[in-house]
């Protein structure tokens, strides 16, 4: 099969449907097909446009498929989705989208489906979604917000007035959020350097020390990135790390650190002194942290493969601990559209809650009296956030909720059990954090 951006996008979509991990799959396919420049950008745009609008695309296509999409072979299904995405959302002429889709059936050895692909797309590309009649509000949200049933039901129940916007809201103004490396440049100097390189819309964010910018390609492809002038980290994530209030000379633990963005901010706050233990449960993810630390030039970080649900004698008692725990990810649905289709299985949710609680209990044992523990997630699920903190305080009366020194951006919902960022209210990712003080 000859390499071309449409074929690469379809191949990646087939694999993503089977395996998940959208960004890793796309990167691997782009490298395999040796795509660069515009072809690489076009393939990426098709891939993410399909993920972002899959619910809408599937609804339209199924109006013209009596047996449904599920009965089709995976390559044919993804060829249809990719072509409709191009015509509907990417300003590709209908004729070009349809003709290239028919060619792809031959490339993927599905020539027998070429007639179906041609007929379905010629009708689907002109479908008027305004004429759709939905069974109920859940189906409307699934189609117009492009979400699976479980996520749609969760949002409709917990955030009924914001549900659709939560699914599609572009956090950080649709820009990339960065953090300057103080070993190389302050915020103003970084903004000047980025602007001089032609990066557009460079400005300071609402979180102290954050920078927002619009890159033409990947921010990791910039020479300034390779030289360690900045790292990429969402504003909400930066806020959580700032609430740790790490200081020079202290012993600090980052228990669930990969890929390392918050570790870098903590090292910055410590002015590259003291000792920062940056941990993750998987060795390959620990290597991501090491790579980031080396690129930025911090020397006060020790990386460690560690299961944070267990006490590790290799870890010392700490002055401050960050526990950015595994979570359902329901706060970053616009950023990671594949999460919109996840199954919210009660048994798996119970396991996740137990893991979060175990990590909190480990942190409680490792923290010195008078120390600061920050718990954070990238979800807007109350069970994983406020209710998790309430249960922790019941188990650990030696802790109380603390008020961080950093000012929360407008729109944060602050309760007795922590602070919540909902994208539509703060302009940042959906995120929860709670600062806790160990009183004895």
Report residues per predicted region:
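S-adenosylmethionine
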Residues: 1-440
